[in-house]
Structures are given as C-alpha cells and as structure tokens.
C-alpha cells in the first residue's frame, strides 16, 4: 500500500514540512514560513535538568497546535493510539498520517538512542511487509521503519515533558480561500501575547530570561561527566557535562529541525512576507529585529557545534562567556520585536482584501 498522490520533499522543519507536503496532496501549496507563522507556536522554551545532563531548549511554545490549518480552512483530525492498525485505517483512505515520534527512536537516523526528543514529526505514506514508508523532512529520500520500531518511537517516554504520547494527525479536506491579511494579524497577535505572557515561566521571554540565568550557572551545575553519543563515530562516550551541554545546545539550535537559528530565520521571513503583503511597517520592523536575532542564534549554534569531547576547560569557559553575552543581546532584540507587535491590529488603510488573498503561490511559496 502506498499513497501515490504524495510527493516527498525534504524541508526546514519537521512539523511545517509535514503539513506542507500533506496539503500538497490536496492541491494546495503553502511555504513552511507561512505555516510556521500562522500556527502561532513560535517562541522559546527552556527546561532545566535536575541532574548534570543537558538542559532542553526549544524554539517553539506549542507543538502541532493546528491553528495554521484552522486559519487556512483545513479540516483536520487528531487522535491517539498505539499499534499499526489505527494508522493503517487512515492510510487506506489515501490519507498520509502525520505521526509524532521520539527522534532518537528512529533507526534510520542512526542516533542509537542518543538525544531523545519527543516533539518530532514524520509522515507515514506507505506500508508493506510489516514496514512503514516514512517521509522525513531531514532526508532527500523516503525511509522505512518496522511496525515495532515505529511503535517504540510513538510511545517513548524518554524526553519528558516533551513525549510523543502516540499523537497522530490527518488532513481530511481543504476548503475556502484564506486571506492572509486577516488571519495573519490574528496569528501574530496570538503568538506575541503567548511569548510576552506565556502560561508557564519556562516559555516565551520569561523562559529566555530563565535560560540566561541557567546558563550563568552551568559552570557549577554542569560538572563531572555524562554519556553522550558522538557524531564522529556514532558511539556513546563519557564526556564533560559542560561540553555535552554546549554541543547539545548547538544541535538544538542548528540541527534538530529548526530551519537553523532556532526558527528565528523562518519567523522573520514570515513577518517580512506578511508585512510586504499588507504594507505594514510595524511587521517589517519586527522582521528586521528578528533577523538580527536569527543571525546571533545561527552563529551561536555553529560555534557550539565545534565543541568536542577533547575541548579543554579554558575553551569551554570561553564558549560559555560568549553564550552569556549572545543571549543578553538576543533578549533585547526579541523584546524589541515583540513590544513592537504588542496588540497589533490591521492598519486602517491597507491593501485591498482581494490583493491579500493567498490564492496564488507567488504570495507565499
């Protein structure tokens, strides 16, 4: 069994790639940047470990909120359940299944169980001989995974509080022609509100402030050694806890499906596209501030990826000092962007609604 209308394309972020590729099955094209912007989940999250293992840093505050799909007039359904049958029932209806999994449990990633992350998404687009065909944003070709391995990835409890919890999503139909000039403001306003005043202090700008404080303590909290999988040989080795933390942060920023720069380049491009479309300088100013933040995040992530098991203590301390300085500058830039978008509403005079319709790919793809 294979869903022949599905075309695999790699992408920047697992979640937006999955949505983009499944929407294309219904004949609709949206860019990943627009899907990220409309979904409203952009932001920041920081979860401190109680041991000396690496703290968790993420660039989103919601995982598959479904807001983008609702704003675009897409009828979708979410469900939970383990085992293959619940997935095959949907695929028999020619519906690709967007499955949430623990990245470290996907055998074709060859991570050997290292760096668990339960907020990863893949599309299931085929099944034969006990193997699912997987469309993964990180690969240029389709992958395969056994039913048992997929079930382990979907039921993993290894990355609290971000476990997959057996969630799956399908798109049933697409109706209507969305107006970015209307739904875009709604999405931005909701996102900014959640970043400025999140539901818990680990998220948004308060979370970024917590992160800055946590980083300042890493020289005391990230001591001793921890086990870490090295990309050089794929093996698990004992490494400095601080080195593990710094490289893990680099991976979170640049590698693990964020589009680079912890989603900041993607969101700044969304703001720029939206601002150009509706002629709103407030959006363009915020896009510029977020672009500057994106540059800092990207440089930071790339530098941290250079940290290795052989990095000396002096090198680690130098990287830590640079990180502290960068986070302080990032906070100021992102605060400026969010304050500029606080309670944003459509301009009294803007482009006609007809011109703002997302009815051609030139507007958003």
Where are these regions (language model features)?
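Short helix-capping/linker segments at secondary-structure and domain boundaries
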Residues: 24-33, 271-278
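Exposed alpha-helical structural elements
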Residues: 18, 63-67, 86, 149, ...
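Conserved active-site-adjacent core of cysteine acyl-enzyme catalytic domains
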Residues: 1-27, 38-176, 345
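Noncatalytic regulatory segments and standalone regulatory/sensor domains
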Residues: 129-256
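Short alpha-helical "patches" and their helix-cap loops
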Residues: 31-42, 281-288
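Short, charge-rich amphipathic segments
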Residues: 1-8, 16-24, 47-59, 121, ...
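Charged, long alpha-helical assembly modules
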Residues: 243-365
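Residues that form generic nucleotide/phosphate-binding pockets
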Residues: 25, 71, 90, 153, ...
């Amino acid at each position: 069994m294979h869903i022949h209308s599905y075309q695999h394309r790699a992408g920047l972020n697992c979640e937006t790639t999955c949505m983009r590729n499944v929407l294309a099955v219904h004949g609709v094209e949206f860019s990943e940047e627009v899907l990220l912007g409309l979904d409203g989940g952009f932001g920041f999250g920081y979860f401190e470990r109680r041991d000396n293992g690496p703290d968790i840093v993420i660039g989103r505050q919601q995982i598959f909120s479904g807001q983008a799909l609702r704003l675009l007039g897409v009828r979708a359904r979410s469900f939970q359940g383990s085992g293959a049958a619940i997935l095959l029932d949907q695929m028999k209806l020619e519906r690709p299944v967007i499955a949430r999994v623990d990245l470290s449990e996907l055998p074709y990633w060859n991570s050997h169980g290292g760096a668990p992350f339960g907020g990863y998404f893949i599309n299931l687009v085929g099944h034969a001989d006990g193997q699912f065909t997987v469309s993964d944003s990180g690969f240029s070709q389709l992958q395969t995974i056994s039913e048992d391995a997929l079930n382990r990835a979907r039921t993993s409890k290894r990355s609290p509080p971000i476990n997959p919890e057996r969630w799956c999503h399908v798109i049933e139909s697409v109706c209507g022609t969305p107006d970015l000039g209307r739904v875009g403001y709604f999405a931005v306003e909701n996102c900014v509100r959640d970043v400025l005043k999140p539901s818990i202090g680990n998220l948004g700008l308060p979370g970024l402030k917590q992160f800055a404080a946590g980083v300042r303590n890493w020289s005391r909290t990230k001591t001793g050694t921890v086990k870490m999988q090295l990309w050089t040989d794929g093996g698990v080795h004992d490494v400095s806890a601080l080195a593990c933390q710094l490289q893990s942060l680099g991976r979170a920023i640049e590698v693990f499906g964020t589009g680079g720069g912890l989603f900041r380049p993607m969101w700044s491009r969304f703001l720029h596209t939206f601002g150009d479309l509706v002629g709103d300088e407030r959006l363009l100013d915020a896009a510029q501030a977020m672009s500057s933040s994106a540059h800092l995040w990207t440089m930071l992530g790339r530098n941290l990826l250079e940290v290795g098991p052989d990095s000396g203590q002096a090198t680690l301390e130098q990287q830590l000092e640079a990180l502290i300085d960068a986070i302080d500058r990032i906070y100021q830039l992102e605060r400026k962007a969010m304050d500029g978008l606080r309670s944003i509403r459509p301009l009294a005079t803007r482009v006609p609604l007809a011109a703002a319709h997302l009815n051609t790919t030139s507007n958003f793809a």
